[in-house]
């Protein structure tokens, strides 16, 4: 019988906790699908689809992709209870994840949103969250 090692819950400082709470609040206020983007230096990466109950990260491409390396991961995330796992996955596999974009009710993020001004943004360390 194979036993799986239980992963320790990550420890976050106050800024990280506040940031995760802000992201959760924004997701809980949204209706329908949203698009999450992880990118570096204004280069858009893959799309991530979410609703107020959960998120499926189709392809997680971290900043290592833009520095000659490449990392890809598929994972199911329960946004309400487990959204911080996205940050933990990013921390484990890349030195920096620069930007997370959230665009409500849009499947394809138009090029005009690359570097576009946003209505709301919160940040913690290397992470930024934008609500257009």
Regions found by a protein language model. Give the residues of each.
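Conserved class I S-adenosyl-L-methionine
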Residues: 31-41
